[in-house]
Amino acid sequence: MTERVAILGCGYVGLELGRQMRADHDVVGVRRSDDGIAAIEDAGFEAVRADVTDPESLSAVPDADWLVFAASSGGRGAEAAREVYVEGLRTAIDHFWSRADPPERLVYTSSTGVYGDHDGAWVDEETPLDPQTGKTEVLAEAERVARERPAEHGGHGSAARFAGLYGPDRYRLDRYLEGPVTAGYLNMVHRADAAGAVRFLLAEGHREEVLLVVDDEPVEKWAFADWLAEQCEVSFPPKQTTEERLADDGLSETAKRRIQTSKRCSNDRLRELGYEFEYPTFRDGYRDAVREYRQN
């Protein structure tokens, strides 16, 4: 039997997931905007217009064996995030599991931001959460919904905690080449591996409640910026300590908490399950971006 996967909020990672799965699975991408629908169609799989906060519109989405909830709040504040990540997720779960042919499982795409600050120490799936902004508190709440709500209907839910996403259109070279670069750790995962890890969870039938999705090598921001400058054959960028950055009077409280957050995320569990990274470290993942920069 060919499984059908419905990707709710089929954006940056969802489009890549659909491209990876379309050869062996029936894939449906769900967005609410014209541009979103066009992007799904361009990626080569079925597009359906619906809104996760509107159960009536979700009726247009066909039955699916697997659900991936990757909707975005569009960079807005905590209340907008709650509407999508918590209420929208709850609405989608209740809608699909009320059908005569409900899904088997759900994967919700979360963020390593739920850990908060660990002063550069390692964190893994067993580390207690300590969200320090309104939005990351919402993400932690959404994880609980993703794990618990499907179980109430006899299904299974998982949360895939993505580290900082990068890849096509998101290399952000100027940020690190021009600086100033603030101290702290970077935890990253290439878009291909963020999508690949979700595909792996679904296709291999792994039923982890929570899984960290991050590459092999957390790196200090200063070291990464210097490596990138060296590869691009430009001068090393200016740097700031955390204290120097926090002295900026224009920072919001949310920005200050983000700057003070430092941790190293472990992918040991994902590796133990057998996932093979396409881009194990930033050195692999930034190769094409560096080549393009040097050619220009």
Stretches with model-predicted labels:
Residues 159-161, 180-202:
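Substrate-positioning beta->alpha
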Residues 91-133:
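Conserved Rossmann-fold NAD(P)-dependent oxidoreductase catalytic core, especially the SDR/UDP-sugar
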Residues 14-15:
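N-terminal Rossmann-fold NAD(P) dinucleotide-binding loop
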Residues 119-159:
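Catalytic helix-loop patch of NAD(P)-dependent Rossmann-fold dehydrogenases
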